[in-house]
């Protein structure tokens, strides 16, 4: 008897242990990401050829305590390596684990390599060569909690590589994961017709066909690790291999099951057909190009097993939520009598099926933790009538109170927006407390900003409500899900502060009181235009005629554009971000504005104020951040703490009869009027003049003040 370890993805341990016991292995013991077992050489060959779940099988040669580099070397040296592989064969060492005296895996591998070549040399045999890429003989070593295990890679390359895959789609499903889905779903114990409406390159269906036809998954492999092992019994292996080939021939003849696969991508169906041909099961599987929502049950009872798309694979979250909801609806209506098994990494997506699971399990697709849910469908439900909507949009009867509020707001704001000559506005701002989001309409697109939920509300409840918003919104607005983007508004730290939200790039041009602006709806948290400052920007434009205008903390220069269109004599636009300065230049070009009178400066605005007190402007607009500790700034900035000092310096740049508009978005901001008056500055609050209709639900969104030199 030999001792082995069968490695597998995390979460496979129970299934793999059961499989090994069925093969006849003894001393079966589950471990993390694998199972220990004992077997004869003949059984080990069979397991290696027939296992559908293991990734790798290693023959354990040494196992014991190890506390020093010397012990590591001695343990490896004591192994009779010349009895395991010839000096004419190349070898490599995979070392896993660190701790104690082992700081890195390279050190451990080097020590074992030295011991191996020294053992060959001391036995009077030429030393074998090391080959890292494709060695003849692989040694596996693991070090954990002071225990060292040295093994021979018995199986060779990962066993999930069956040998039939020609190429893959965007998000390939490993063969042993597909097999485990079939095992854990209960299908393997009671095989019936299988349907996969998101079949991709066909892996689930091919694995099911291999099981049903009694075809060993290792038959197509070209190489196994034991082939260069000195104790390899070629005759025994050949008998086992020939037996498996005979079983495959007979199994395909006897297999009466049919398998059905479809995918919306024609090139994936071509790959799936090629893979099935390579696996020898093409005649058992019927592939077709089809949208999953158009697939119908090929038989009255069957098993739908699939790995549909989720966020890590492809797609916009709103589209995916819609897809999952529509799938669940379709399953209930058309798949009565079927079982459904779905693998998905996103709990909210799989919850959007709105089906009650018989079983809920966890599986790992690589490092990605996934939910694997099993459903039994009974009587069909009746189809509901829906009103006429744009293609791709579905009315979803979820969150009716929210949907009704959206419809009400659309009626209120559409006429107003047209009258105001704007096509971007806030449609909804946490009007209903349980749906704690802001929804902005940008031309024909919608951006949802999720506010941070109170700590008292469970995360699962928050996620469900967001899912309901995303599901209900397309129908309520009559727009396609791909025109909806979700962003999370919460406290950001470090590198996450400006993390890109969406891999898609959606840019639109919006119009506002005759001005045009470029928006990026999916790049960074902010789109390039603060809608709450719309009226303030118009005020700047109305006051700008014939004046020298200064715009500080200018962002993308939208207030500068209004000033230029309003007839400013000159406009100076300053921001610390070069990205925003370039964006401002684009906005000017978009409006046909060019010339020497428009100046763009990338600078620390606070330092620039100090360095340019000699300059004079008739109109100044400044909208600083609430807080900043940018590395480009010498000191941190807090608008409450520092505004009086900053405005006291800025007033020096204001001409005698000039006006300074100061705005910020700090809630509970308190203007230091006394300090400013002492500095010779008159201060007037103009919030009521600068609050747009679409922000009247949230009157504290910003603070706007008009400052002038005190009258003498």
From Swiss-Prot:
It is found in: Cytoplasm. Keywords: Cytoplasm, Methyltransferase, RNA-binding, rRNA processing, S-adenosyl-L-methionine, Transferase. Its EC number is 2.1.1.173, 2.1.1.264. Residues 43-154 form the THUMP domain. The keyword Glycoprotein does not apply. Its main location: cytoplasm. It is an enzyme of class 2 (transferase). SUPFAM superfamilies: S-adenosyl-L-methionine-dependent methyltransferases. SMART domains: THUMP. Pfam families: Methyltrans_SAM, RlmL_1st, THUMP, UPF0020. GO terms for cellular component: cytoplasm. Gene3D superfamilies: 3.30.2130.30, RNA methyltransferase domain (HRMD) like (3.30.750.80), Vaccinia Virus protein VP39 (3.40.50.150). CDD domains: AdoMet_MTases, THUMP_AdoMetMT. It catalyses: guanosine(2445) in 23S rRNA + S-adenosyl-L-methionine = N(2)-methylguanosine(2445) in 23S rRNA + S-adenosyl-L-homocysteine + H(+); guanosine(2069) in 23S rRNA + S-adenosyl-L-methionine = N(2)-methylguanosine(2069) in 23S rRNA + S-adenosyl-L-homocysteine + H(+). Specifically methylates the guanine in position 2445 (m2G2445) and the guanine in position 2069 (m7G2069) of 23S rRNA. PANTHER family: RIBOSOMAL RNA LARGE SUBUNIT METHYLTRANSFERASE K/L, RIBOSOMAL RNA LARGE SUBUNIT METHYLTRANSFERASE K_L. Belongs to the methyltransferase superfamily. RlmKL family. This is Ribosomal RNA large subunit methyltransferase K/L.
């Amino acid at each position: 008897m030999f001792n082995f370890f069968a490695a597998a993805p995390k979460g496979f341990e129970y299934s793999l242990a059961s499989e090994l016991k069925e093969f006849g292995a003894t001393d079966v013991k589950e471990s993390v990401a694998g199972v220990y077992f004992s077997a004869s050489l003949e059984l080990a060959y069979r397991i290696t050829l027939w296992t559908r779940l293991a990734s790798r099988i290693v023959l354990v040669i040494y196992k014991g305590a190890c506390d020093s580099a010397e012990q590591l070397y001695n343990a490896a040296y004591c192994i009779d390596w010349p009895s395991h592989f010839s000096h004419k064969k190349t070898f490599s060492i995979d070392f896993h684990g660190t701790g104690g005296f082992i700081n890195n895996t390279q050190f451990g591998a080097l020590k074992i390599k030295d011991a191996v070549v020294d053992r060959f040399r001391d036995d009077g045999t030429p030393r074998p060569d090391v080959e890292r890429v494709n060695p003849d003989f692989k040694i596996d070593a693991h070090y954990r909690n002071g225990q060292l295990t040295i093994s021979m890679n018995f199986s060779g390359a990962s066993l999930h590589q069956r040998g039939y895959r020609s190429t893959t789609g965007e998000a390939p499903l490993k063969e042993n994961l597909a097999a485990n889905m079939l095992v854990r779903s209960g299908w393997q114990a009671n095989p019936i017709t299988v349907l996969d409406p998101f079949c991709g390159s066909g892996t689930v269906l091919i694995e099911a066909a291999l099981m049903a036809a009694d075809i060993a998954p290792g038959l197509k492999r070209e190489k196994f690790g034991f082939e260069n092992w000195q104790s390899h019994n070629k005759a025994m292996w050949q008998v086992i291999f020939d037996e498996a080939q005979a079983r495959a021939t007979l199994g395909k003849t006897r297999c009466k099951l049919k398998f059905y696969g479809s995918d919306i991508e024609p090139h994936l169906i071509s790959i799936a057909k090629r893979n099935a041909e390579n696996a020898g099961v093409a005649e058992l599987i019927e592939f077709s190009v089809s949208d999953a929502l158009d697939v119908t049950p090929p038989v009255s009872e069957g098993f739908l097993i699939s790995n549909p798309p989720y966020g890590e694979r492809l797609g916009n979250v709103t589209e995916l939520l819609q897809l999952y909801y529509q799938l669940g609806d379709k399953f209930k209506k058309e798949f009565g009598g079927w079982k459904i098994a779905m693998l998905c990494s996103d709990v909210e997506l799989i919850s959007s099926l709105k089906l009650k699971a018989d079983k809920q399990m966890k599986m790992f697709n690589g490092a990605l933790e996934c939910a694997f849910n099993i459903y039994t469908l009974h009587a069909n439900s009746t189809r509901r009538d829906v009103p006429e909507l744009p293609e791709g949009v579905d009315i979803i009867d979820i969150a009716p109170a929210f949907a009704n509020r959206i419809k009400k707001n659309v009626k209120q704001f559409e006429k107003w927006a047209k009258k105001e000559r704007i096509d971007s506005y806030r449609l909804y701002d946490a009007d209903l407390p349980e749906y704690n989001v802001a929804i902005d309409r940008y031309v024909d697109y919608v951006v949802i900003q999720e506010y941070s939920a109170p700590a008292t509300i469970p995360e699962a409840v928050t996620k469900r409500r967001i899912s309901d918003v995303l599901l209900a919104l397309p129908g309520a607005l009559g727009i396609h899900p791909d025109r909806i983007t979700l962003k999370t508004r919460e406290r950001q730290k470090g590198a996450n502060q400006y993390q890109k939200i969406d891999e898609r790039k959606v840019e639109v041009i919006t119009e506002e009181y005759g001005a045009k602006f470029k928006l990026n709806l999916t790049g960074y948290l902010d789109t390039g235009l603060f809608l709450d400052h719309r009226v303030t920007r118009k005020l700047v434009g109305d006051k700008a005629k014939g004046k020298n205008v200064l715009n500080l903390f200018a962002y993308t220069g939208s207030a500068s554009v209004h000033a230029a269109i309003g007839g400013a004599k000159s406009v100076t636009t300053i921001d610390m971000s070069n990205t925003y300065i370039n964006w401002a230049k684009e906005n000017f070009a978009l409006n046909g504005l060019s010339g020497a009178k428009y100046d763009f400066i990338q600078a620390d605005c606070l330092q620039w104020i100090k360095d340019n007190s000699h300059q004079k402007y008739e109109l100044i607009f400044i909208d600083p951040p609430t807080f900043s500790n940018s590395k480009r700034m010498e000191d941190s900035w807090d608008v409450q703490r520092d505004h009086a000092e900053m405005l006291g310096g800025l007033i020096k740049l204001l001409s005698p009869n000039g006006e300074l508009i100061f705005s910020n978005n700090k809630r509970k901001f308190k203007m230091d009027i006394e300090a400013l008056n002492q500095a010779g500055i008159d201060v007037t609050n103009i919030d009521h003049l600068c609050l747009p209709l679409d922000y009247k639900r949230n009157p504290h969104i910003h603070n706007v003040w008009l400052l002038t030199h005190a009258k003498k």
